[in-house]
A protein has these predicted regions:
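Extracellular/periplasmic, surface-exposed regions of secreted and cell-surface proteins
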Residues: 28-29, 235, 241-250, 255-260, ...
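Short beta-strands and strand-coil junctions in structured, solvent-facing domains, enriched
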Residues: 1-2, 23-25, 39-41, 60-65, ...
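Short, glycine-/polar-rich solvent-exposed loops and beta-turns at beta-strand/coil boundaries
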Residues: 2-12, 44-49, 66-71, 231-234, ...
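Glycine-rich, aromatic-lined ligand/substrate-binding cores of catalytic
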Residues: 745-778
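Residues embedded in well-ordered regular secondary structure
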Residues: 1-14, 24-26, 30, 83-229, ...
Length: 904
């Protein structure tokens, strides 16, 4: 199982992939099942304190009951239930403080930045201006000061030093004079981040009941401040679980969960000035956040507030006429959602000592309802809506889904023979309704309603519907607790396919041999358990994506009814229908061994192969044809790997205990076949037959020319038959771009976790570490800091070793204003890392103390999440996503928290 760090945005969650890429363009997400019924709600709406157990089902046999929706694995969540007896009350409180979980990228300070920019201007004067090296320094300083390439603003208002630029930097050495003093120094990223944002959570639960009826009721509140100023997340939630044995032949129960989520968010994952993670990280250190007077002192308004500098005279690369810190306060991004989930079941039968013994009929119904509303507001004074005097967009969405199944089971044991048979029917329905409107033109700022704006610029509404109907069956058999066999068959019908291809047939078989229960093993006492298991099955997948969103009408043509044509209405076809579209199939083979040795060591090793055929993809088309693409079954892919689990009770049955759990996984991915053409290229990525999915595809660097400082590349010529010639070195970027090569992928060679749990009397300590070895990352932030050519952007400290003079030996080429760069293998960073993810220390007060004051138990805790990350590049988050790219996203946060847990 692989997880990403996800966004550090409060309330956001991580992504999960089970055993590699399941498809080329379909959803990779596993199915979440809560209390036996598939769950479509927000995972963040479930209070972790309400969860009793969580289990991951990986192979086809284990997940067969969940059909097509479980093709990418199943995560089973069971919530807490009540117990018979008197009412038990549990109270929990946690208080924490957060900070950045990863350090910042190493960038240049004011002096280093100006020295680097000077070198860039100087190189430009020599290469493009025809100026001699002896005079280029003086010319560079003049160009920095005035003219079309000036970067210091009017009258050098953005020169942070107490000398004019022509006096500040030596034109020969390129160094800032030693006696220069800073007039101001402000860090945009520091100004954007909150100092020690707080997190507090409170939970109260009540459980109890009789022998016949049991209940659990809980309430929770979470208040989490974001690391980025103005961002936050609040959650109010309640859960009620009831289970009742109504008669000796009828059991029934229900669970209901309500959650109110409220978020103030911020733009992320984009290279736009409205994204603070982009603008603040890339703002050169010479530009102040607040206006400065002639002496470099901050300017204040009549109310004593510092006046933001909106950069009217800043260069374009420094977000001219924009202050991204000000937009944190002046703009608004808010969402609210009400999440309601319900589960109801009734189970009839299993009458003892009758011919109906072992026969049960159960009915399960579960629904998930999400009503959400969001608002995006851009102020009229600063930012991207100044020209239209501000913008407001409001949107509402309603998601409703339900699953209804009826299951008939027969479970009997005859001597050493145990049979369990199941047949059932299931229906799943999903509906999504969306409505939004956008207006511009406000008389002044701070108005967050549509009525306050004057001009309607957009209005949109749409509805998505989706349904799946299934008939399912399963047979389990075991003999003498030694031999286990299972088989399942189901047929699923999906509304995403045309009627001729709507139904898919899927099946699985599996077996388990408990070798340790054989008579010939009876004398081997040090083997407590030894099992050999194997399974094979085929599951279906219909979850094709359109971009990052689900495509609910996969086989049909799409029409754009909002096509711009003055005041005339009409429709334009945007994608083609494909009635031949059919189920994607995942064939899973799993072979494993489980062992328990010396009553101390447990181990599991599994080898798996997952072959995907008829892969679903939104296939790209040439835009000249008038269509973006169409949906198609495009080929096949294979994942193979090994999962290893090792648990050791290093010390047990003593006052001090120590348990060590090691997890390790490998995965190898190969695209076996693509329809129509052997490869699909997208920027620096390629999907090619015979290679790993989403392989990096870039030019190959061949060093830096010591004489000129130019980047060199490996290239080759191709003859008329397409045969590649011998490689040679060139400085021609166009040639290098035409000679791209596969440079690896994000997929690691080995990844896993290490968990240590220590206990001594009332104390317990757990330390969870995760690791990944191998794979590569294309870090967009680092590469922009290193190769970005916009004047006004911050620069990486790595540029200190960039080429400057003939004879320099280095791996970083000369820097030059306006010079373009291409992505090479030098841009890829080793993705290996080791992270201490969680440290939890607890102390349970002695029970006799608690009993004396009427408490059952009391526990004190201290927890640290995202403690430290060790990797190959300071500032990089190699856990960001599964494809190996990084963007300007909300950094993950480290949280230190303290709590108390009382039961009475």
């Amino acid at each position: 199982v692989q997880t990403t760090s996800g966004s550090g945005q409060p309330g956001s969650g991580s992504s999960v992939v089970v055993r590699g890429y399941g498809s080329i363009n379909s959803s990779q997400s596993p199915l979440y099942v809560v209390d036996g019924v598939p769950y479509d709600g927000n995972i963040s709406a479930i209070n972790p304190n309400d969860i009793e157990t969580m289990t991951v089902l990986k192979d086809a046999s284990a997940g067969a009951l969940y059909g097509s929706r479980g093709a990418n694995g199943v995560i089973m969540i069971t919530t807490k239930k009540g117990n018979s007896g008197k009412v038990k009350v549990n109270l929990k409180a946690n208080w924490g403080v957060s900070s950045r979980a990863i350090p910042r990228y190493e960038t240049m300070d004011e002096a280093g930045y100006l020295e680097t920019i000077f070198q860039s201007y100087k190189n430009n004067q020599i290469i493009n201006g025809g100026v001699s090296p002896e005079l280029a320094g003086v010319a560079a300083l003049e160009a920095m000061k005035s003219g079309s390439t000036a970067m210091l603003g009017q009258n050098e208002q953005y020169n942070p030093f107490n000398y004019s630029i022509t006096e500040l930097i030596d034109p020969v050495t390129g160094k800032v004079r030693s006696d220069a003093k800073l007039r101001y120094s402000e860090d945009w990223m520091d100004e954007a981040l909150k100092s020690n944002p707080l997190r507090q959570e409170y939970v109260a639960s009540f459980s109890g009941g009789s022998d016949k009826t049991k209940y659990m009721f809980s309430l929770g509140y979470l208040d989490e401040e974001g690391l980025l100023k103005t961002t936050k997340f609040n959650r109010y939630n309640g859960r009620l679980n009831i289970d009742s044995e109504v008669t000796n032949w009828l059991k029934a129960g229900m669970s209901a969960n309500y959650s109110r989520n409220e978020s103030n968010t911020a733009v992320e994952n984009s290279s736009g000035s409205s994204n603070v993670w982009y603008s603040a990280q890339l703002m050169a250190p010479i530009f102040p956040v607040f206006e400065k007077d002639a002496n470099g002192a901050t300017v204040y308004d009549n109310l004593g507030n510092a006046v933001f500098d909106y950069g009217k005279n800043r260069p374009a690369g420094a977000s001219s006429e924009w202050n991204t810190i000000a937009t944190l306060y002046d703009d608004m991004y808010s969402t609210q959602s009400d999440n309601l989930s319900g589960r109801v079941y009734a189970e009839l039968g299993d009458l003892k000592n009758t011919f109906l013994q072992g026969l049960k009929f159960s009915v399960n119904y579960g629904f998930d309802l999400i009503n959400s509303a969001g608002a995006t507001y851009y102020n009229p004074y600063n930012g991207n809506s100044v020209a239209v005097k501000g913008t407001i967009q409001k949107a509402t969405a309603r998601t409703f889904s339900y699953t209804f199944n009826q299951l008939l089971t027969y479970d009997r044991k005859f001597g050493d023979h145990h049979f369990e048979a199941l047949v059932g029917h299931e229906f799943y329905k999903y509906r999504y309704d969306y409505l939004s409107a956008t207006k511009t033109g406000f008389p002044f700022g701070g108005l967050y309603e549509l009525d306050a704006a004057t001009t309607i610029t957009g209005a949109s509404s749409y509805q998505n519907n989706y349904a799946v109907q299934s008939v399912l069956s399963r047979l389990n058999y075991d003999f003498a607790d030694k031999y286990y066999l299972s088989a399942s068959f189901r047929t699923d019908g999906s509304s995403r396919f045309y009627k001729d291809n709507r139904w898919g047939k899927f099946w699985s078989v599996g077996g388990n041999w408990r070798i340790s229960h054989e008579s010939f093993m009876s004398d081997i006492t040090w083997i407590n358990n030894l099992s050999l298991k194997a399974s094979y099955g085929v599951q279906g997948n219909d979850a094709i994506l359109n971009g990052t969103k689900q495509n609910f009408y996969a086989w049909q043509s799409f029409y754009d009814l909002g096509y711009a044509n003055s005041s005339m209405s009409g429709a334009a076809v945007t994608s083609l229908e494909n009635k031949e579209l059919k189920w994607e199939k995942n064939a899973n083979l799993n072979i494993g061994i489980e062992a328990k040795l010396f009553d101390r060591v447990s181990a599991t090793i599994e080898w798996y192969q997952r072959k995907t055929t008829d892969m679903l993809m939104s296939f790209p088309m040439a835009t000249s044809l008038g269509f973006d693409g169409y949906n198609k079954n495009v080929g096949s892919m294979r994942n193979t790997g090994i999962d290893l689990t090792l648990g050791i009770d290093i010390f047990k049955d003593t006052p001090f205990t120590w348990n060590l759990t090691l997890l390790g996984s490998t995965i190898k991915n190969k695209v076996l076949q693509l329809a129509d053409k052997p490869e699909i290229i997208s920027g620096s990525y390629i999907i090619r037959e015979g290679e790993t999915l989403y392989s990096f595809y870039t030019a190959t660097a061949a060093g830096v020319d010591p004489a000129t400082g130019e980047q060199l590349y490996w290239a080759w010529d191709t003859d008329e038959n397409g045969v590649k010639g011998k490689k040679y070195i060139t400085n021609d970027m166009a040639k290098a771009t035409a000679c791209k090569e596969i440079q690896g992928s994000r997929i690691p060679d080995l990844y896993g976790s290490i968990n240590n749990t220590f206990k001594y009397k009332g104390f317990d300590l757990s330390i969870l570490c995760t690791y990944s070895i191998g794979g590569k990352v294309l870090d967009g932030i680092y590469n922009t800091l290193l190769y970005g050519n916009y004047v006004g952007q911050a620069k990486s400290k790595m540029l200190e070793r960039a080429w400057k003079n003939p004879g320099d030996i280095t791996d970083i080429p000369r820097i030059e204003i306006g010079k373009s760069y291409i992505v090479t293998d030098n841009s890829l960073i080793d993705a290996s890392y080791f992270a201490i993810k969680n440290i939890a220390l607890g102390y349970s007060l002695p029970s006799k103390w608690m009993k004396s004051i009427g408490f059952d138990s009391a526990r004190l805790t201290a927890t640290a999440d995202n403690v430290v990350l060790f990797n190959h590049l300071k500032g990089m988050d190699p856990q960001y996503n599964f494809t190996g790219g990084t963007d300007f996203g909300y950094v993950p946060v480290r949280t230190i928290s303290f709590g108390i847990d009382i039961t009475f």
